[in-house]
Amino acid sequence: MTIEIPVPFKAHNIEAPSQMVETSKSEIVDMFTQAYLMRRLEIASDVLYKGKFIRGFCHLYDGQEAVCVGMEAALTKEDAIVTSYRDHCTHLGRGGTPL
């Protein structure tokens, strides 16, 4: 299926990307499933942190799951990613497990 991005991208000194995106229903459902799992992990982490089961700092990523899912859609598993914190979803996106 082809999806058209209605608002054009603004680019500076580069060619703007296409406003047409090719995808499939299964790819969209997979992205939603990944984002949903990431959100559930963040909510569970919040509960554990507030229950004092996680010590130190717990920087949560809820509300940003689509960033990680979109990034993973554009990258390959061979591409390197560097994070400093709020990396629970990156762990899942790279193929890690919630446990």
What are these model-derived regions, one by one?
Residues M1-V67:
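Conserved acidic/glycine
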